[in-house]
Amino acid sequence: MFIYAIGTETRQKIGISKNPHKRLKQLQTGNAEQLVLHHMIEVHDDRTRLLERFLHKDIGYKKLKGEWFNLTKQEAKDYLTFAEITWVNDPLLSLKL
């Protein structure tokens, strides 16, 4: 499973998918703005939803609606890279929710 950042220059959807490229096509359907897969990290299946919930909570102050956040593509890439280094294998992640 992957956690991805798909969006525009200034708005990002942070979500999970087995196939982020397919998910991009699904999200693009009916969306007037051109969406791009900006970044993705691979996460063990048993930790994917936990990490996604944690990320959504951690950047909740930038939330727009649903899983969409007020993040530039570079902020999203930097954030997911940081998450991969810091939290993907953190055994105490569930305690941080």
Regions found by a protein language model. Name each.
Residues 1-97:
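Non-catalytic accessory segments flanking enzymatic or RNA/DNA-binding domains
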